[in-house]
């Protein structure tokens, strides 16, 4: 993901109270295609709810014109999926 796109995300991270954000999946591995979405895992500074996650996703998609999947670190459980997120993790904020 180009640095310019990451810089565009930072004001949104600040406005949503994001403590940490990282890419994972094909974009983090550099294997994305034009049809790929951006997989993002975040941690909030404060208590959050589903509306915060959905709002962040929508605002990122509107600002960058690419589809996003947003999950939280808190939602990760042990197992293959969590392992793959941590293996691919490329911290871009926090």
Annotate each PLM feature.
Residues 1-20, 28-34, 45-94:
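Catalytic core of pol beta-like nucleotidyltransferases
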């Amino acid at each position: 993901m180009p640095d310019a796109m990451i810089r565009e995300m930072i004001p949104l991270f600040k406005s949503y109270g994001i403590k940490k954000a990282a890419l994972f999946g094909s974009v983090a591995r550099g294997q994305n295609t034009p049809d790929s979405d951006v997989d993002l895992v975040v941690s909030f500074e404060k208590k959050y709810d589903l509306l915060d996650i959905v709002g962040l996703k929508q605002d990122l998609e509107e600002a960058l014109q690419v589809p996003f999947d947003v999950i939280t670190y808190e939602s990760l459980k042990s197992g293959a999926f969590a392992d793959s997120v941590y293996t691919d993790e490329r911290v871009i904020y926090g």
